[in-house]
Amino acid sequence: MIRKKKKVKKIRGSRTCGGGSHKKRRGAGNKGGRGMAGGHKHKWTWIIKYCPDYFGKYGFKRHPSLVKRLETINVGELEEIVLKNPDKFEKEDDKFVVDVIELGYEKVLGKGKVTIPMIVKAVEVSEKAREKIEAVGGEVVEL
């Protein structure tokens, strides 16, 4: 059986309920405002010390409509697609002709392995992808 009296019960009746002076524990007024209030005034030294970059302008964000994002595909994935359905792709001099734009992509990146020679047509091709395609006897055609 618990015989200890709760702290709240002991405190009830006293004006400040264990908060010290009546001036203390007055809410946000006691802390100099809520959050970052006073950052340019009485909390300026704190800002300078702990958040020096809080105020001011740094760079800008371009509007999403102006940002050009290319749909990308890796060389390894491209080869997988060709190997799964080889009858969908034309052949020129024993090389598969892969038009990346028809597949819904614009740029070819260099992740993965290339084992079959391909003629890859794309808007952009990374250096690594170009090296891998040409290493097995393929070609790259930038549109």
Curated annotation (Swiss-Prot):
Query: What biological processes does GO assign it?
Result: translation
Q: Where is this region: Disordered?
A: 1-39
Entry keywords, A to Z: Ribonucleoprotein, Ribosomal protein, RNA-binding, rRNA-binding
Which residue ranges have biased composition labelled Basic residues? 1-13
- What are the protein's GO molecular function terms? rRNA binding; structural constituent of ribosome
Quick one: a GO cellular component term? large ribosomal subunit
State the superkingdom: Archaea
Q: Gly residues bias: where?
A: 29-38
Q: Where is the signal peptide?
A: none
- InterPro entries this protein is in? Rbsml_uL15_N (IPR027386), Ribosomal_uL15 (IPR030878), Ribosomal_uL15/eL18 (IPR021131), Ribosomal_uL15/eL18_sf (IPR036227), Ribosomal_uL15_CS (IPR001196)
SUBUNIT field: Part of the 50S ribosomal subunit.
Which family does the record assign? Belongs to the universal ribosomal protein uL15 family.
Role this protein plays: Binds to the 23S rRNA.
Q: What is this protein called?
A: Large ribosomal subunit protein uL15
Q: Which gene encodes it?
A: rpl15
